[in-house]
From Swiss-Prot:
Entry protein name: dTTP/UTP pyrophosphatase
GO molecular function, one term: dTTP diphosphatase activity
Taxonomic source organism: Schizosaccharomyces pombe (strain 972 / ATCC 24843)
Key words of the record: Cytoplasm, Hydrolase, Nucleotide metabolism, Nucleus, Phosphoprotein
UniProt catalytic activity: dTTP + H2O = dTMP + diphosphate + H(+); UTP + H2O = UMP + diphosphate + H(+)
Sequence positions bearing Phosphoserine: 38
Length: 241
C-alpha cells in the first residue's frame, strides 16, 4: 500500500484577483461596449471583471415625453432601450462591430415624482431637504438593456434583453440644514439625479438602504451580469436554430 497522502488542499489563489467565469472566457478579446459616458458606470462594469470595456455615448436626446408613460420606470426602460439601439446602430457598420452592447438609465422617484438633476444651488438644497423630510424612502430605478448581435439574418439582427432594478433609500431625518448646505457647496451632487452621490460624501446622508447599492450608483452589477449571460445564451441558441 502506498504511503503517499492524497492532496486535499484547496486550489491556490490566482494572482491579481482575476475573475474568470465562462462568460469572461467567452468575451475575452471581444468588443464590449457600454453605451454611457459615465465614469461611475464604467468603474462598476470593470468591477464585474471586464477591464476591456469601451464606452460610447449614445447621443440619444433622452427627451421622451414622460406623460406618455403610465409609470416612471417605463420611461427609464424605454430610454435605456433607445440608448442601446442608438449605439449598436452607430457601431454595427464598423469593421470591428461590437459583440455586446450594454446601456442603462437611472431615475430617482419620491412620491411618484421623478427627481431630476438640480438646476442650481437653490433647487439643489430644496431637493435634498425634500428627501430628508420625507417619511417614506425614495426609490431608485435603473433600467439595463443588453444587445447581442445575431449571425443569422433574422430581424432585427440582434437579441435584446432588458431588466429593471429597484432600490429603496432613506435619508437620515436628523441631518441639519447646515450639513445639507455644506453638501450643496461641495458640488458633488450637482450633476446627479436626486442631488447626491451615494458612493461619495453623499453616503453621510443615508440612514438605510434596501436593495443593490450599485444600483443607486448607476448600474446594478449582479443584475447586469445575469442579463448579459441570458442575452449571450439566447444569441447562441438563435444562431444555431
Amino acid at each position: 500500500m502506498s504511503n503517499e497522502k492524497m492532496d486535499t488542499s484547496p486550489p491556490s489563489y490566482d494572482s491579481h484577483f482575476t475573475l474568470e467565469t465562462s462568460m469572461h472566457r467567452q468575451l475575452k478579446d471581444k468588443r464590449i461596449i457600454l453605451a454611457s459616458g459615465s465614469p461611475r458606470r464604467k468603474q462598476l462594469f470593470e468591477q464585474m471583471g471586464f477591464p476591456n470595456v469601451e464606452t460610447c455615448v449614445s447621443g440619444f436626446p433622452e427627451d421622451l415625453n414622460k406623460s406618455m408613460y403610465i409609470t416612471p420606470w417605463e420611461y427609464a426602460a424605454d430610454t435605456s432601450v433607445q440608448k442601446a439601439i442608438a449605439v449598436y446602430e452607430k457601431l454595427a457598420a464598423e469593421e470591428d462591430s461590437p459583440d455586446i452592447v450594454v446601456s442603462a438609465d437611472t431615475i430617482l422617484i419620491l412620491d411618484s415624482e421623478i427627481m431630476e438633476k438640480p438646476n442650481d444651488p437653490k433647487h439643489h438644497l430644496a431637493m435634498l431637504k425634500k428627501l430628508r423630510n420625507s417619511k417614506t424612502p425614495h426609490k431608485v430605478f435603473t433600467a439595463v438593456s443588453v444587445i447581442v448581435p445575431m449571425e443569422v439574418p433574422i430581424h432585427p439582427g440582434y437579441v435584446m434583453k432588458t431588466h429593471l432594478e429597484e432600490t429603496q433609500v432613506k435619508f437620515d431625518p436628523s441631518i441639519t440644514d447646515e450639513f445639507l448646505e455644506a453638501y450643496v457647496r461641495c458640488g458633488e451632487g450637482s450633476d446627479k439625479a436626486g442631488g447626491y452621490a451615494i458612493q461619495g460624501h453623499g453616503a453621510l446622508l443615508i440612514e438605510s438602504i434596501i436593495g443593490d447599492f450599485s444600483n443607486v450608483v448607476g448600474l446594478p452589477i449582479r443584475a447586469t451580469f445575469k442579463l448579459m449571460e441570458e442575452a449571450l445564451e439566447q444569441g447562441d441558441a438563435d444562431n444555431y436554430d
